[in-house]
Structure formats: structure tokens, C-alpha cells
Amino acid sequence: HAGHIPDKETGSRAVPIYQTTSYVFKDTEEAAALYNMEVGGHLYSRISNPTVSALEQRIAALEGGASAIACSSGMAAMHLVVTALCSSGDHIVASSKMYGANINLLQHTMPRFGVETDFVNPNDLEAIEKAIKPNTKMIFGEVIGNPGLDIMDVPAVAEICKKNRVPLVLDATFNTPFLMQPFN
């Protein structure tokens, strides 16, 4: 039940599924404030809705994070984080022992947008640190590598990231928040 407060009116523990695509605004000022991202709220279900917000709040609570963004797939999440952190001319240091689709995204798709990646052994801390460049925007790895089940030393890599002021992005698909909370 993490991250969810039961409905005050009904006492329901379950979150209703909101089957709407659009929302009513009090006035044009409220609509303008929402569209300008000056206030929080729902504009259109493709962007957000109360059902997805409940999921995001629960995931954030389980992971120990401040907030979360729900994506339609793991690769959508990966693409979202890469494009949020990187622009043309930027660089990524990534694990060489990870899910093939992640490697394909970084090795074949992102170079078309001017983002280069160096792949390193996730257990070679010296290689990770040496691969960092002035334009490195993230270090990416999997807590438990897919398919080889390689275990990344997350605390050690996090220290390298802190020292170099580079975000550590982790794919935790193979483990649950019960076993690993990367924020901790």
C-alpha cells in the first residue's frame, strides 16, 4: 500500500481507473497555468492522469525516491532519461554487460543525435573513472546485468559519480525495491 492514501470519501484502498482523455478547467487562467507548467494538475491523459499519478507515487515510495515517471516500457524509460540528460556533443559511460536493447540504443541510435558512449566493464572501477570526459552527462549500468547476472558495485560506482559530479543512472529491472534501493 506504499505511496497511497485511501479515498477519504469512500475509504477505498483501490485506486479507480480514470477512463478520460481530457479535463475540465475552472477558467482560462487555470488552463493557461497548467499548460505553462506553473501549477501541477492534469491536462490530457496521454500526459498524466490520476491513475498513473497513483502508480508513480507508489513506485517513488517503494524506491525511496521523491517522485517517479511511469513509462510504457523499460526502453521508453531508458530513452527518456538519456534524452533528458544528454544533448548533441555529450558523452555517456555505460556498462558493457547489459541488456542488448540498451546497448543498441547507446551504440546505434544516440550517435545519430550526436551522443557518444564508451562501454566499460562495470566491475573495473578504474576503467569507469578513466572513461569520464568533461562532456560526460551520465554513467549508466544495470544493478544486475542482463543476461549475465553481473552484479555492479553500486556504492563504489556512486562514489566515482559523486567525485566527478556525474549522475549515476541504474536499470534495476532484475531486482525489486525490497532487495535494492539505489537512492540509499
Residue ranges and their predicted role:
Residues 1-39:
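N-terminal glycine-rich, Lys/His-bearing helix-loop that initiates the first secondary-structure elements
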Residues 10, 62-63, 113, 164:
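Residues at alpha-helix termini
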Residues 10, 44-48, 121:
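Alpha-helix initiation/capping motif
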Residues 27-79, 101-108:
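Conserved N-terminal alpha-helix of the aminotransferase class I/II PLP-enzyme fold
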Residues 68-184:
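Conserved PLP-enzyme active-site core in the AAT-like
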